[in-house]
């Protein structure tokens, strides 16, 4: 056994939880993802999906992907930089840019590679990147790959953000990067105050709308639109894997920024482009959410109903303002145990443990879709109450 294998063989945390019978990961889904799924031979309510609009199983989205595959084939066999650009990619980029209110957009193969590729090439050694300490891992990796000076501020603490900005050279680029909706806690960035500080310190703002697109704002245009601050935000990032029922991501900004990224973002230049099916599916989902406002209304009816039910049941749910509802456990082992008990009762939820959160903030994450019914929500709440009470968590 080599040194690397010897080192990695010591990592046995997954095996510990497997031995206890509470290991929650990599469960196989046997069919389409909707509000109910077949998983491991069991029929369960799905409250762990990011498909907020409920479009992953929509026949129109599926048919759009099939038609694109028939026309363009199964893949593009190259990067966007060379032979991998389809007219379909360009159409999606134009419509996304218009949707989020920016000059242009670029599509990437995944949301993760948007952040890791864009952030890493925007700044140099004399510049600064300032992040919320609960920003997504893709933002963390993007700033780590950059050569810039890196600062973090306490979660949604605007006084601490200002303190970090005061450390920066006033003549250097200062890029503030923030999740519009924080993916584990469900709360929103304090975008109005961030914009105020942007002007005070001549900074630039990038907002990750992964969990805001399709959820907030007019027609689901995102948190920036929700606050009426689209034109104050310099870069808007989004994904296709959530509300747009596909896989991929995009960055939208003014033409000068997009021109730079098109020729310098390594994850764009050196990755194969989005498949025709994925691109067409995202485009169709984008059309649907713009043309069916009742879908957004249904999402918020389900969300508000679930928030009320969980609060009434006595769960600690923090400051969430979104379809992401954290049920705090504050103990890693019990987080896995309550996830297992819930699954045995027929409810799939996601455990959140370090490094996705601080050790004292472990939780199970419930996520709502536009297609969830009150009956499904009531059933989930009832079963989660039972699971939490079994562990003396309620």
Swiss-Prot record:
Top EC class, one word: transferase
Record family assignment: Belongs to the class-II pyridoxal-phosphate-dependent aminotransferase family.
UniProt pathway: Lipid metabolism; sphingolipid metabolism
Protein name listed in UniProt: Serine palmitoyltransferase
Annotated source species: Bacteroides thetaiotaomicron (strain ATCC 29148 / DSM 2079 / JCM 5827 / CCUG 10774 / NCTC 10582 / VPI-5482 / E50)
Gene3D superfamilies hit by this protein: Aspartate Aminotransferase, domain 1, Type I PLP-dependent aspartate aminotransferase-like (Major domain)
Assigned GO CC terms: membrane
Function: Involved in de novo bacterial ceramide synthesis. Catalyzes the condensation of L-serine with palmitoyl-CoA (hexadecanoyl-CoA) to produce 3-oxosphinganine. Also capable of using alanine as substrate leading to the formation of 1-deoxysphinganine (1-deoxySa). Contributes to the levels of endogenous sphingolipids in its host.
Something else known: The bacterial ceramide synthesis pathway operates in a different order from that in eukaryotes. Furthermore, phylogenetic analyses support the hypothesis that the bacterial and eukaryotic ceramide pathways evolved independently.
Cofactor section: pyridoxal 5'-phosphate
Keyword Transferase annotated: yes
InterPro entries noted in UniProt: Aminotrans_II_pyridoxalP_BS (IPR001917), Aminotransferase_I/II_large (IPR004839), AON_synthase_class-II (IPR050087), PyrdxlP-dep_Trfase (IPR015424), PyrdxlP-dep_Trfase_major (IPR015421), PyrdxlP-dep_Trfase_small (IPR015422)
GO MF: pyridoxal phosphate binding; serine C-palmitoyltransferase activity
Binding site for pyridoxal 5'-phosphate: 111-112, 183, 211, 239
Record PTM N6-(pyridoxal phosphate)lysine, positions in chain: 242
Outcome of gene disruption: Abolishes sphingolipid biosynthesis and leads to cell lysis.
Assigned EC number: 2.3.1.50
BP GO annotations: sphingolipid biosynthetic process
